[in-house]
């Protein structure tokens, strides 16, 4: 779908459809009031007759309104004006896109971006409208042979901004929104792909294709098991021993700043393309969803695509830690003691706590890049789901300024995170009689002890950990990958690059 931005009066628009808001109870938005005045009270008369209350989700399509050049006007219920927040705004946009498609509109001029959303500027409203529109239209049907094509005639959406001064920020918002939406789609597509197709080799092929598409400043290197062995990544290798699919680590390097002292930001994504639990095997119910255990790597891939598309003037490295955790004659066992790349030893008490065993070696590997910061993204613990549910990502870090940056980016993007503690007292739960540490610390504070485990491998740089176990995918009727936290990380990198969304 094509997006553009303009500034103009609603009555002068020659379009198939104009979209304006109506508040509860039967209150016209400022733009709707202009149209009502031009049409000699036509719209307000309809509202007085009870045609539309303005409740969220309500719609009313008007044809050939007097003195209005556009063929149709779509009135969208926005709820109570003072209660219009970010979440409600996105729901209004979603309802708009679905209604326009259902009613056969091929193009529309949308004035909803002029609604007042507390604390949000026009850049934010336009960008979120683009991202929400793309999200609304997303479907994953690549593997279906009998595809039912939904009715989607809408091809062009024009967002109106109040004055010409905001056109530049509006155009930038569309550019950013489309790049972020494409990154989210890429992450969702990878996450939704079945594990018999999406293994570590498939992740590597996607990483190579990204380098081919943006060859000017993207390089991809794939590190196989033999190289991992030479590097001493025995913990990473142990997790994949039971699988016939080779473990592969894909390193995507984007260089947007040629300065010698420009240190990279490193993103590390857990890429367990299927996690059976290994010898500590999971229950069969819901095990199919363990294809989503690579959503951290999928998110990193999506972010790298966004960075390359926007040609951000920073250096970013994305690592996709591809692996598969399966039971078998060669699988690692509870009781094994592994020597990590850092030289520290780990007693395996549960083979289903495997993500941290992969990540710890990758976190050691990335020291060679002398990073400005390292952020790992992982569907790491069920404990984080218990703590925060399915709405907010867990954040842990060894660096307060980095925490503040990420929390701010999560608020800006609407892809929210919440900081969990990382106190020394939790480290005691990882003590082992037979190694430097155990790979689990018991049930209490399980998300935090997992973060504590990783923190032991991140002492040489500023580091943050995002536990997306509760936010990476949805179950039930709307089952599928969410693409989170692509939006959060994209905003973080946009801020680092100087594009903080201020007008």
Curated annotation (Swiss-Prot):
Reactions catalysed according to its record: Release of an N-terminal amino acid, Xaa-|-Yaa-, in which Xaa is preferably Leu, but may be other amino acids including Pro although not Arg or Lys, and Yaa may be Pro. Amino acid amides and methyl esters are also readily hydrolyzed, but rates on arylamides are exceedingly low; Release of an N-terminal amino acid, preferentially leucine, but not glutamic or aspartic acids
Residues the record marks as active site: 282, 356
Main location: cytoplasm
A GO term, aspect molecular function: metalloaminopeptidase activity
Pfam families in the record: Peptidase_M17, Peptidase_M17_N
Swiss-Prot/TrEMBL keywords: Aminopeptidase, Cytoplasm, Hydrolase, Manganese, Metal-binding, Protease
Name this protein carries in UniProt: Probable cytosol aminopeptidase
Residues bound to Mn(2+) 2: 270, 275, 293, 354
EC number: 3.4.11.1, 3.4.11.10
Compartments, record wording: Cytoplasm
BP term (GO), one: proteolysis
Cofactor note: Binds 2 manganese ions per subunit.
Family annotation (SUPFAM superfamilies): Macro domain-like (SSF52949), Zn-dependent exopeptidases (SSF53187)
Entries under Gene3D superfamilies matching the protein: Leucine Aminopeptidase, subunit E, domain 1, Zn peptidases
GO cellular component labels: cytoplasm
Protein family membership: Belongs to the peptidase M17 family.
NCBIfam families: PRK00913.1-1, PRK00913.1-2, PRK00913.1-4
Cofactor(s) of this protein: Mn(2+)
Function: Presumably involved in the processing and regular turnover of intracellular proteins. Catalyzes the removal of unsubstituted N-terminal amino acids from various peptides.
């Amino acid at each position: 779908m094509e997006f553009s931005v303009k500034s103009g009066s609603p009555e002068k628009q020659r379009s198939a459809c104009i979209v304006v808001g109506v508040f509860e109870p039967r209150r016209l938005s400022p733009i709707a009031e202009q149209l009502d005045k031009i049409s000699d009270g036509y719209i307000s008369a309809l509202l007085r007759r009870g045609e539309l209350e303005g409740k969220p989700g309500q719609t009313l399509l008007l044809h050939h309104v007097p003195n209005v050049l556009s063929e149709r006007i779509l009135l969208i219920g926005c709820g109570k004006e003072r209660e219009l927040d970010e979440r409600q705004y996105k729901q209004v946009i979603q309802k708009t896109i679905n209604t326009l498609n259902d009613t056969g509109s091929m193009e529309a001029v949308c004035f909803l971006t002029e609604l007042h959303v507390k604390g949000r500027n026009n850049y934010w409203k336009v960008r979120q409208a683009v991202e929400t529109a793309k999200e609304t239209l997303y479907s994953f049907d690549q593997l279906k042979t009998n595809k039912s094509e939904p009715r989607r005639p809408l091809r062009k959406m024009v967002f109106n901004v109040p004055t010409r001064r905001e056109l530049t920020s509006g155009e930038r918002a569309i550019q950013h929104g489309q790049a972020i939406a494409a990154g989210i789609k890429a992450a969702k597509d990878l996450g939704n792909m079945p594990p018999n197709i999406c293994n570590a080799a498939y992740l590597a092929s996607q990483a190579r294709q990204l380098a081919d598409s943006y060859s000017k400043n993207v390089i991809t290197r794939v590190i196989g098991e033999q190289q991992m062995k030479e590097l001493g990544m025995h913990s990473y290798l142990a997790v994949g021993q039971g699988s016939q699919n080779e473990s592969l680590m894909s390193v995507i390097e984007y260089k947007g700043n040629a300065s010698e002292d420009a240190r990279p930001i490193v993103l590390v994504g857990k890429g367990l393309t299927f996690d059976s639990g290994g010898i500590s095997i999971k229950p069969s119910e819901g095990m199919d969803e363990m294809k989503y255990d690579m959503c951290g790597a999928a998110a990193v891939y999506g972010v790298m695509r966004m960075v390359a598309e926007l040609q951000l003037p920073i250096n970013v490295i994305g690592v996709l830690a591809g692996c598969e955790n399966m039971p078998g004659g060669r699988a690692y066992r509870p009781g094994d003691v592994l020597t990590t790349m850092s030289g520290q030893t780990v007693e395996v008490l549960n083979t289903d706590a495997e993500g941290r065993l992969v990540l710890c070696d990758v976190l050691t590997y990335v020291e060679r890049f002398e990073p400005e910061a390292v952020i790992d993204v992982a569907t790491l613990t069920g404990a984080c789901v218990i703590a925060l549910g399915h709405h907010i990502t867990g954040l842990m870090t060894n660096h307060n300024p980095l925490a503040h940056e990420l929390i701010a980016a999560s608020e800006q993007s609407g892809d929210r995170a919440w900081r969990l503690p990382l106190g020394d007292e939790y480290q005691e739960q990882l003590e082992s009689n037979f190694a430097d540490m155990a790979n689990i610390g018991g049930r209490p504070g399980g998300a935090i002890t997992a973060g504590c485990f990783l923190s032991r491998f991140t002492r040489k740089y500023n580091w943050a950990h995002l536990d997306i176990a509760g936010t990476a995918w949805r179950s039930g009727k709307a089952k599928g990958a969410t693409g989170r936290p692509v939006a959060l990380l994209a905003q973080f990198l946009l801020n680092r690059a100087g594009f903080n969304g201020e007008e």
